[in-house]
């Protein structure tokens, strides 16, 4: 697993807004260092590559993304990764917004029916489970997304 996310300056890397898929390519340089390139196919069918994307991102975002990638690679369940991210106390408003976006994206991959600890805020029952990326009470139907 690899998580690639972060805040980037508008003029540092242009990807057309209609591009929703692409590939991240890990390139090992002759000196042993790694760099990551982003490759996508444009509307005309041409392959485009943006080299060295890791140099473009804010270091804080990049480091958190590497940490999340590592715990996913070692098979930490996605719902536990979401809880880990949720527990981060970050000072910067931008990185808190980033944190919420990462949680929202990862929740889409939690298997339906996965139980969560805690009581439903509406009915008080301990019947919370993930459905379609949202935490849902199996007793009363209360649902919280995001």
Where are these regions (language model features)?
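Long, C-terminal-biased catalytic regions of enzyme "large/alpha" subunits
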Residues: 1-146
